[in-house]
Each structure stands twice: as structure tokens, then as C-alpha cells.
Amino acid sequence: MSYEERANAHPNLGDESDVEEEALVNDYREQVNFDDGMSELDRTTSLGGGSQTQDLQAQLAAAATPLEYQATLETKFASYDNYCSLFHYILNSDGPVELEVPSYYWAWDVIDEFIYQFESFCRYRNRVARSGSNEEEAQLLRENPNTWGCYSVLNVLYSLIQRSQINEQLAAIKRGEDPLAFAGEYGSRPLYKMLGYFSIIGLLRVHCLLGDFSLALKTLDDIEMNKKAMFARVMAAHFTTYYYVGFSYMMMRRYADAIRMFSHILVYVSRTKNFQKGGNSYDAIAKKNDQMYALIAICVALHPTRLDDTIHSALREKYGEQLNRLQHGGPEALPLFEELFRSACPKFISPTPPDFENPALNVDPVDHHTAIFMDEVKNTLYNPTIRSYLKLYTTMDLKKLAGFLEVEPEKLRSWLLINKQRSRQVRWVEGGLLEGEPVNANDLDYALENDLIHVSETKAGRRLVDWYLRNLARVY
């Protein structure tokens, strides 16, 4: 099959056919069955042989191995030095490093662990600076401000992407052209291609942790978000990608797109969970699974919409009571919004080292982004109550509605204007993840003419044919 035919065979983002879903599930089953308990890195073989290649294999194996939970500060410093040495050798050797690798897993493990150690070190450093309780560690951190620095980590990821020319290769695949024509001397090697590819997913994660959600989505411009993508072949990478894309959409108030992303991966996980058990990443995936259901509950409360039956049932089972409270709105829902957000959001980090001399000036990045999100929630607190009244009328006097709500008419007018503005969302149709068209996100619309509210409502009928087909498949 030519590259053009393969490109045309790729489904678009909205393609959710059962045949392709089943194919991906079967592919994942094969991956699990193939794993005989040995690490993928243990099966790595060398093209060149010799001690130098064996040393590189050992370094890659160490880079993919999680650091101990209670690792000392000196161990974290040493781990950073080891990563620097490894990536310097890969990126700056005279010519590409000759190493053949058998699978995608090892490259994801290396990038994933690299970013996890960066994230955990930043949180630890911020915690030491804010507490001021351990002067010895604070002094060590003060003397080494560039260790696990944001610039260093981003430089590694961007360098791996540039060296492998992976973006050019992905763009060529989109155009139906041969990616090897754009790969260059380095990008044609699996070592560089895989590290470069998963560095793109790593950039998505890092930019999201830093709070730059637009740039996070921008990094995936050349990656097709479908079941044929390379990241979809590694369960942890598949899950991570959709989690951070969905969360970025949520923070940009694109709730419909966030729900679509979360729903896609949660449906997939529900179909593969029986043979995930026992895998190394099962516990982490199960935790992220619960977090995404919490985020869907938040999104549905802020943007009422119909969910897939599988997602809706699981959501009711996990967060039924909380979802009802969120959907009713009002001041009493604020603590619950904050609780769910804190439990499900990424562990944000600061791009700069903390101020060790003035601990009180250091702000927890999670607190900072939670406050930003809660400001948005406060703007929409009374939307459910207002909607419940407006649904009863086609026209209504502003002062009459203000009397029902026991608020000043001008305050109600500002609420209505905010709600009207929030109901217009950008929704993805095609192209890059940042692209989209503004649409009215609610089934209830209204217009203000002086003090008269004109209300219109559109109701989408339930697609009974799809419902019957899904349930017949379960029975038979």
C-alpha cells in the first residue's frame, strides 16, 4: 500500500466505527499477550555490538526505570546528570547512534520517566522553599538552580524532535508522501524517530503542566488524533495524550471538545480493562481513569450535554451524587467543584525556581490554577437556576425573572450576558486541535431586547436506532 493510500485509510477524528475500535482493542490484546514479563528494553539488540552500545543500552534501561519514591536529593541530582549524559551522547555524537530497537515501549518509558522526574523535582523544590523547614536541602537547591531546570528539559525535548525531523515526517504522511524522504540521516533510525515522536507527547504534557494550554495543543499539529497514530499503540501514551488534550480544552472553556476527548479514551479503556490487569501501568491508568470521570462531571455541569451510554452509566456510578450537586449550581456547589478539580488536575509546576529567601512569596502552582478555574466557575454558578426558569417561557420580562431569583435586575442582566457569551464555544471540526468554529453550545438560546427576554429552545431527539444496536450487541 502506498503512503497516499495509507493516509487516505486513516480515519478522521470523528470516526468512531466499531470495526476500527475492535481492531485497536485486538492490537492491544496482542501487545499484552506478547509481554512475557520481561521488559521491552531487555529484548533490545545492537547493530554495532561492543561495550559502547551495551553501555548505551544500560543507560536507556536506567532512564526508563522509575526512581525510588523516597529517593534522596543527591539521587535526584545524579539522575539528572545521567539523563544529561545520555541525551548529550544521543544528540551530539559524530553521526547517528546505531542501535536497533524492537518496539515503541522503551522510547515512551524513557520520555515518560524523564518528565515525571522533572515534574516531581519541581514540586519537591517548591515545597521545600515554601516550608523553610530543611535549611540543608534548601541550601543545596539554592546552589543548583539549573538542575532539572525548565529550559534544560524543554531543550532536550525540542532537540530530539528537531534531530529526528519527526514533524516533517508526520506532515509528509498527512500529504500521502514517503516520510523517509524527509527523515534525514538521524530520523531514519528508530532510536531517533521514536524518541522524537514521544517527545512531542512529552511537550504536550510539559506545556500543560506549565499552564500554557494553547501551546500544549499546538505541539500536536502534525499528529493525527486517531486509532492509527503511533501513540495509540502504547496504552500509557494513548491515555496520557487524551488526558492532557482534554484538560487543555477544558481550561480553554472548550467543554464540548474536552468531553469528546475524555469520552473517546474512557470508552476504549472500558473495552480493554479485562486484559489490562496485571500490567505495569494498570494502577496508574486506573487512577487517571477516575480523574477523567471527575473532569467529565465538571465539564457536563458547566456544559450540559448528552453522553455516550457507557460513559453516562459509569459516571453515575462513580460520581452520581456529586454530579447532581454540581448540576444544581449555587454557592453550595463551589467547594465540590474545587475538590474535584484538585483531585483530577495535573500537578502543575512553576517555570522558574522558587524564592528561598522569602518563602511567603512562593505560590503553589496548583493553588494558582485552581483559583483561575474557580473564577470561571463563579461566573456560571446561577446558570442552572436561570435556565430552569427560561425553559418555561418564550418571552419573559427581566424584572419578573429578577423577582423570582431575588436579585437586582441589573445584576441579572450581567449574569445573562455572561451566560450568553459563555454559551458560544469554539468546537473542533477539522484541522489542528486549536482550530474550530464558534457554535452555540446550549440547546437554550435567548436574546435581550431592552428588558424583554426572547427565549428559543432546540431539542435533539434521542437516536433510538443506535441505542437498540448497542444493547442488542450486548444481549446477543
Swiss-Prot record:
Q: Which GO terms describe its cellular component?
A: eukaryotic 43S preinitiation complex; eukaryotic 48S preinitiation complex; eukaryotic translation initiation factor 3 complex
Domain PCI, which positions?
Answer: 257-452
Q: Which UniProt keywords apply?
A: Cytoplasm, Initiation factor, Protein biosynthesis
Annotated InterPro entries: eIF3l, PCI_dom
Localisation? Cytoplasm
**Keyword Cytoplasm recorded:** yes
Q: Provide any one GO MF term from the record.
A: translation initiation factor activity
An example GO BP is:
formation of cytoplasmic translation initiation complex
The main location class comes to cytoplasm
Pfam families recorded: Paf67
Q: Which PANTHER family match?
A: EUKARYOTIC TRANSLATION INITIATION FACTOR 3, EUKARYOTIC TRANSLATION INITIATION FACTOR 3 SUBUNIT L
Known role = Component of the eukaryotic translation initiation factor 3 (eIF-3) complex, which is involved in protein synthesis of a specialized repertoire of mRNAs and, together with other initiation factors, stimulates binding of mRNA and methionyl-tRNAi to the 40S ribosome. The eIF-3 complex specifically targets and initiates translation of a subset of mRNAs involved in cell proliferation.
Family assignment? Belongs to the eIF-3 subunit L family.
Kindly state the subunit structure of this protein.
Component of the eukaryotic translation initiation factor 3 (eIF-3) complex.
This protein is called Eukaryotic translation initiation factor 3 subunit L
Q: Which organism is it from?
A: Aspergillus niger (strain ATCC MYA-4892 / CBS 513.88 / FGSC A1513)
